[in-house]
């Protein structure tokens, strides 16, 4: 993890300062597992999570309508472009981050200063995430937005793939929820959503027929 932010590094060759938001969400989940398996103490895990949420909550850390970029500088909190036009919010990577943060919110429930701060900061971050902004007023969600390039990436999120968690979190937001029609007409509308074929005697409900439902990370990332 990055020594100042606590965020996960982007692979071994991503540079000393490049942190990945989605991978950091997985890291938060791994910290909880590490506590349960006895690899670290609850107190050690709580301090690591607190470092992450402090960094994400800092006013100098870039966020866009409550979402983060795919990559950011783990020291300064500034966005590192993933590609030429992908230099702002990535709601899929942000959803993976929130997946971990919300699990931590429900795990660290003791009444002590550290765990109280963790829950309070995560709750603030969760309530600031503007999921409905990323629909552009349409019945589908868009993967990217940036102040420099707006909606230029123009990547609609449709299923079935690793992005299901985006719609789940968007629908459950207490402050900026998406409408039900966004799920049904957006995520569930693609011809790669429903399957129903049998492979090796197992009926597959969702996923692309050509790829036997797709790779396992389609399921792993959201569930």
Question: What does each of the following model-derived ranges do?
Answer:
Residues 1-19, 63-72, 171:
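Low-complexity, Ser/Thr/Pro/Gly-enriched N-terminal "stalk/linker" regions
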Residues 28, 46-57, 98, 119-130:
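Hydrophobic core segments within long, regular secondary-structure runs in both alpha-
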Residues 3-10, 39-45, 65, 111-118:
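Surface-exposed patches in mature extracellular/periplasmic domains of secreted proteins
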Residues 29-78:
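Post-signal peptide N-terminal segment of secreted/secretory-pathway proteins
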Residues 28-36, 99-106, 167-170, 223:
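Short glycine/serine- and small hydrophobic-enriched flexible loop segments
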Residues 14-18, 35-41, 84-88, 208-212:
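Second-shell loop/turn segments in exported
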Residues 22-26:
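Hydrophobic alpha-helical transmembrane segments
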Residues 62-94, 107-223:
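Extended ligand-binding clefts on enzyme/binding-domain cores
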């Amino acid at each position: 993890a990055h020594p100042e932010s606590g965020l996960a590094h982007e692979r071994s060759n991503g540079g000393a300062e490049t942190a990945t938001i989605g991978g950091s969400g997985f890291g938060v989940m791994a910290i909880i597992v590490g506590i349960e398996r006895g690899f670290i103490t609850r107190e050690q895990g709580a301090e690591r999570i607190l470092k992450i949420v402090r960094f994400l909550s800092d006013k100098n850390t870039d966020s866009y309508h409550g979402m983060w970029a795919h990559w950011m500088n783990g020291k300064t909190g500034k966005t590192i472009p993933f590609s030429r036009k992908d230099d702002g919010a990535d709601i899929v990577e942000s959803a993976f981050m929130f997946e971990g943060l919300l699990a931590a919110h429900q795990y660290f429930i003791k009444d002590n200063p550290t765990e109280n701060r963790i829950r309070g900061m995560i709750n603030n971050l969760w309530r600031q995430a503007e999921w409905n902004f990323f629909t552009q007023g349409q019945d589908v969600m868009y993967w990217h937005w940036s102040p420099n390039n707006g909606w230029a990436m123009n990547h609609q999120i449709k299923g079935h793939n690793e992005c299901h968690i985006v719609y789940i979190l968007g629908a459950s937001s207490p402050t900026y929820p998406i409408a039900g029609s966004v799920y049904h007409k957006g995520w569930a509308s693609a011809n790669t959503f429903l399957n129903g074929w049998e492979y090796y005697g197992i009926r597959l409900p969702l996923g692309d027929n050509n790829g036997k439902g797709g790779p396992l990370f389609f399921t792993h990332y959201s569930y």
